[in-house]
Amino acid sequence: MADNKTDKADQIARLVQVAHLYYDENLSQQEIADKLEVSRSLIAQYLQQARDRGIVRIEVINPMNSCENIALEIQERANLERVFIVPGMHKFQDLTMRAIAGAASKYLEQNVSDSDILGMAWGRTITRLVQLLAPSVPRDIDVVPLMGERGYTGTYSQINQIVLQTAQSFNGRPYFLLTPMFVSSVQLKQDLMNDPEVRPAVERWDKLTTAVIGIGAVPPSPGSIAYVGAKLMRMMQERGAVGDICGRHFDDDGNLIENEMNDRMISISLDQIRKIKRVIAVASGVEKTRAVLAAMKTQLFSVLFIDEMLAESMLNKMRKVEK
């Protein structure tokens, strides 16, 4: 019985995936077939099944749809330059994350120019964003990491790999930060940041023109706890932490929470981020509602990419506070 449910869920997930690639990513049926290593006729069948099951609905709608209305309201309430909301796919987190990454990658391609210095954070959505980059022309840019490597070995935490892939996509120059994010002492941090192999990346933090950051929630996902430690995470929660950006934790009012790890952290400061001309933030999942609402109060970013469920949850909270 369980196997039948699993098979059905897998089948629906495949239909959603194919429909997303065809209707949202504008890939042809042949391109999707090549990507998934199946026949074009099977893709056509999947698309028909998606319509028959109600996964895809073709209808004429008002161009100013609900997502656009929500985006504009959040944008105005938070005084942001742009808010982009990826609609639908509530039950398929991976596809939702990919859709956010796809939208953000296109925005980045269109808004990076020659001579820019681009800073990259790490995270699952940012990793997918980098994988989807396909700028039409090369750019003469520098790409630098915004923090050191995490001890956790998940691929989404490998900051220098993210920097390398981004630089290769734009045909730019990567600058690596071959240090851990957390070190054992303040003196070691200072020594490492002054090291000739590290200094070129760190010195560019004050010259960044664009940055891409993720917004972490507190408590974070189980895998993310590994880079901080359960003890420190409990302490941060007790002090009122609700989220983090580049490892720097903040409270509901967007204020930095001081802790002994800050002095031993090799990561760009929030003040440095605040001075960057264009900062693009990405977040997905309704569980990040509180974190993103607090992050907007930090005034660290001007462009935000989120999913529909998260956006609706955020706006409901914002309206309740107003009442």
Language model features with spans:
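Short alpha-helical
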Residues: 65, 124, 128, 287-290
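Generic hydrophobic alpha-helical segments
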Residues: 18, 100-108, 129, 201, ...
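Short Gly/Thr/Asp-enriched flexible loops that form oxyanion-binding sites at enzyme active sites
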Residues: 125-138, 223-232
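Structural beta-sheet core signal
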Residues: 120, 143-145, 176, 281
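Conserved phosphate- and dinucleotide-binding cores of soluble alpha/beta proteins
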Residues: 2-19, 24-31, 37, 42, ...
